[in-house]
A protein has these predicted regions:
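Short capping/connector residues at structural and topological boundaries
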Residues: 92, 115, 170-172
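Cysteine/selenocysteine-centered motifs that mediate thiol-based redox chemistry or coordinate metal-sulfur cofactors
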Residues: 129-175
Length: 175
């Protein structure tokens, strides 16, 4: 069983979003960092943010609030979609006020009910959209969190591979 996601849009020839479109590349990059921030452990994210110096001021546009979303699945990844169940999420929206790029807004949705995690992720999303902070946040927050996630995936894959059973059928000499 897999969780349903939106299918990738086919490449457009009319100037729409595709792999060669810089806006599309920027959107994919933002999706990647938002995914890393949302999936990171709250404590790891807070530790990484603590290493950044002189963070700009920000105002909370939409305070962190908890809610639920319906998760949909497909049997075998190909069957008809069905409602798998509800999942708790927390969302937050902030706007930077202490930078030259004061109109920058950061968004975050995180699984669970951790309001501080959502606010921290929204702040990092906003900072990553600025020229002044992008490189530092990517180097000190995003890359280390991505490495932690990759290490966890490798460890989990190793544990799964260790329990793999290979079944085979032997054919007897009967006709």
């Amino acid at each position: 069983m897999t969780v349903e996601t939106q299918p990738a849009a086919p490449a457009k020839t009319d100037g729409g979003p595709d792999a060669s479109n810089p806006a599309s590349a920027a959107q994919r990059e933002r999706q990647a960092w938002m995914s890393i921030l949302a999936k990171a452990e709250s404590k790891d994210l807070a530790d990484r943010i603590g290493r950044l110096q002189n963070l700009p001021a920000y105002s909370v546009i939409r305070p962190a609030e908890c809610g639920s979303v319906m998760v949909r699945g497909r049997a075998g990844g190909m069957g008809a979609a069905f409602n798998l169940g509800e999942m708790s999420v927390t969302r937050c929206v902030i706007q930077l006020t202490g930078t030259a790029e004061a109109a920058v807004i950061g968004h975050a949705y995180v699984a669970g009910r951790d309001k501080q995690h959502a606010e921290s992720a929204a702040l990092m999303d906003a900072l990553l959209q600025t020229e002044q902070w992008h490189a530092a946040v990517k180097e000190m927050v995003i890359t280390p969190l991505a490495n932690v996630a990759a290490d966890a995936r490798r460890e989990r894959s190793g544990k799964v591979a260790a329990t793999k059973v290979n079944f085979f059928t032997m054919v007897r000499g009967e006709n």
